[in-house]
């Protein structure tokens, strides 16, 4: 069962399910579409989705896009949707401030939940969105990314 804290407008999801793509001009819709595509991609790879847009009970600013299980491994996923015309990749947009926020979010999740698996990792999914509705979306899955100087323990 997926626990969803916030996930956009249901009509948008329905449109995407029947094959209609966004206009790629609305940044919020682009982000939601990117998260939807990322989630769909991981499900097709056999991941179990535990949480969408998880937020800490203690501090609502701490947010994780997806929390999944890949067999026995707990996976924290950051999804970065960008225009294919961007000068930087989605992975490159995870700057110092975002890394600090992600680290705090992961630590909050680990401290607020018991019965955690022994192994966990951090993945990034880049979603390159076309500049128009006729273009193709490209997804890149970066597994087990080491973006923290500190450990999560």
Task: Give the positions of each predicted feature.
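Acidic-basic catalytic patches of nuclease active cores, encompassing PD-(D/E)XK
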Residues: 1-53
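Short amphipathic alpha-helical face segments that pack within enzyme cores
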Residues: 37, 55, 101-104
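Conserved catalytic cores of phosphodiester-cleaving nucleases, focusing on short active-site segments
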Residues: 42, 64-85, 102
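Active-site metal-binding core of divalent-cation-utilizing nuclease and nuclease-like domains
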Residues: 48-74
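Hydrophobic/aromatic beta-strand patches that form the interior of the parallel beta-sheet core
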Residues: 50, 77, 123-125
